[in-house]
Amino acid sequence: FLGALQSIGSWPSFLSYAVMGGIVVWIGLYTENVFLLVAAMLIAPFAGPAMTLAIATARGDAHLVGRSLLRYVAALTASIVTAYLLSVIFDQRIATELMVETSMRSTVSLLLPLAAGIAGALNLVQSERSSLVSGAATGMLVAAALAPPAGLVGMGLALGEMDIVVSSLWALGIQI
C-alpha cells in the first residue's frame, strides 16, 4: 500500500513523464517506429494511478480514488495535448500507416486491458520476493494499453481524422 502511495510522486515530475511519454509516442507514430512506442510505454506514468486506484477501490478510500482519477486524467490530457501540439507544430498533414494500424480495434483488443488488470492485481497482492514479474514490467503492461491510444487521440484531432480519434477514445475507455 505504501509503495502505491509513494508512486504518486510530485505533480511536476509526474506531468513531465506524461509529456515525455507523449513526445516519444508522437515520434514513434510519426516515424512509424514501433520500438519508440515501446519506449513511450516505459516512460508514460499511467501505472502509478492505475495501481493506486485499484488499492483505493479495494480499501474504499474515496479521497485516494479521486486523487488517482485526477492523476489518470491529467496524464492522459498531457499526452494527448503533447501529441496534438507536435502534429500542429510539425505540420503533419496525413495519418501514417502505423497510426491507422494502431487505431484499428477488434474484439481481441479487449484482451490487453484484461491481461494488464490481472497482471497488475497479481503484482499488488504478491510480496516482492514471490513476484515473478517486477512492478516496472507490470506498469509497462498498463501503459501499453494507454500510451499509443492517447497519442493517437491528439494526432487524430490535429489531422481532423475523427475515425482515429473515436477508435482511440474507445480503446482508452475500455482500458481505463
Placement of each model-derived feature along the sequence:
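Core alpha-helical transmembrane segments of integral membrane proteins
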Residues: 7-87
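Generic detector of multi-pass transmembrane helix bundles and their immediately adjacent loops
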Residues: 70-176
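Short charge-dense sequence patches
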Residues: 2-4, 103-104
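Short amphipathic alpha-helical segments, especially helix-boundary/capping motifs
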Residues: 1-2, 14, 28-29, 95-97, ...
